[in-house]
Amino acid sequence: MQCARSSAGDCHSCGWLSLAYSEQINQKQHNLLDLLPKNYAFTQLAPVESQQVKFRNKAKMVVSGSVEKPILGLRKPEGEGVDLCQCPLYPASFEPVFPILKTFIAKAGLVPYNVERRRGELKFILLTESRHNHSMMLRFVLRSEKKLAQLRQALPWLQAQLPQLAVISVNIQPVHMAILEGEQEIVLTEKTFLDEYFNEIPLHIRPKGFFQTNPDVAASLYATAGHWVKELQINRLWDLFCGSGGFGLHCAQKNTELTGIEISPEAIECARLSANELGLEHVEFQALDSTGFALAKESVPELVLVNPPRRGIGETLCDYLNSMKPRFILYSSCNAQTMAKDIQQLSHYRIDRVQLFDMFPHTAHYEVLTLLVLQQS
């Protein structure tokens, strides 16, 4: 992949861009296997590779410059703005949107936030596309509600220019820190979420909900999880840290008893909507802390699926699962180092199979799916 911004030293997001893609995959696979146990054999499936360009469904743009000439991209440590509207990771459909957004910023008087002076209102623009129907969600991250009325007034012009904007919202982030979003979300459109489909499973993207940024590889990850679980012929499962339900909904058969747990009420609302659309009658999604939910239970299902944040599932949940001994643990991780630490603590389990998914090309990061099987005493 060729990138002018990377070559000029303006953007360092793709730290492995100098490596051939085949070498990137080799290094990631070696890194993964170096972290895993060496005292027994397990199946190592071939890594799932990604497109090298135009694979992202989301742009996170820092807004800098002036209200008349806004810059969408990133801000260098010394404060200079770098335009990333031509980033080769974004789909072609984003390219005509960015100039119109720049014009809208001027029309609505959304002064870019100046970090040094602590002045201005517009901090970030977040753009997400559904690959299902190519509709888009646009979020403006503002310092306050000061410019909200002006934004609302100018909105009809923007919607006429970009009818693909199905969801438009404003997030209020008042803190002078490098935090992407705040607690308050104000949806400005009748529709509140994007519709998406992975492997014929309906999923929904809400403004503050987490969603994978590489949909093709995410579809492979979900499909693989579903295939592995179907082989196990289980009747009950928990999906902990379930997000919008992508894993659990791919793994649930018509009569499977599925309980999905996620701390975010927004994500749970999306998961429930998907389950209803699929007509699944034995599925329950709850907005709770995953570890707290598990520890309150005196029995476990045959399979526990976990998809934790980068910190892993942690010592408390590891100890609980190790003592309760579900037959299978399916572990999806975006941080193989913490996953390996958790697996080491799950001493009653052995790895059956593992597969790497290259969700983040040109970086050292990747996703990994691991099936753990209870060892017979």
Curated annotation (Swiss-Prot):
Listed EC numbers: 2.1.1.189
Catalytic activity entry: uridine(747) in 23S rRNA + S-adenosyl-L-methionine = 5-methyluridine(747) in 23S rRNA + S-adenosyl-L-homocysteine + H(+)
Entries under InterPro entries matching the protein: 23SrRNA_MeTrfase_RlmC, MeTrfase_TrmA_AS, MeTrfase_TrmA_CS, SAM-dependent_MTases_sf, U5_MeTrfase_fam
GO biological process: rRNA base methylation
Chain residues that bind S-adenosyl-L-methionine: 212, 241, 262, 307
PROSITE patterns: SAM_MT_RNA_M5U, TRMA_1, TRMA_2
SUPFAM superfamilies noted in UniProt: S-adenosyl-L-methionine-dependent methyltransferases
Segments traversing the membrane: none
An example molecular function term from Gene Ontology annotations: 4 iron, 4 sulfur cluster binding
UniProt entry tagged with the keyword DNA repair: no
Catalytic residue list: 334 (nucleophile)
Keywords: 4Fe-4S, Iron, Iron-sulfur, Metal-binding, Methyltransferase, rRNA processing, S-adenosyl-L-methionine, Transferase
Keyword Iron-sulfur: yes
Superkingdom: Bacteria
Annotated [4Fe-4S] cluster binding sites: 3, 11, 14, 87
Function: Catalyzes the formation of 5-methyl-uridine at position 747 (m5U747) in 23S rRNA.
Family designation: Belongs to the class I-like SAM-binding methyltransferase superfamily. RNA M5U methyltransferase family. RlmC subfamily.
PANTHER family named in the record: RNA M5U METHYLTRANSFERASE, TRNA (URACIL(54)-C(5))-METHYLTRANSFERASE
UniProt protein name: 23S rRNA (uracil(747)-C(5))-methyltransferase RlmC
Species the sequence originates in: Proteus mirabilis (strain HI4320)
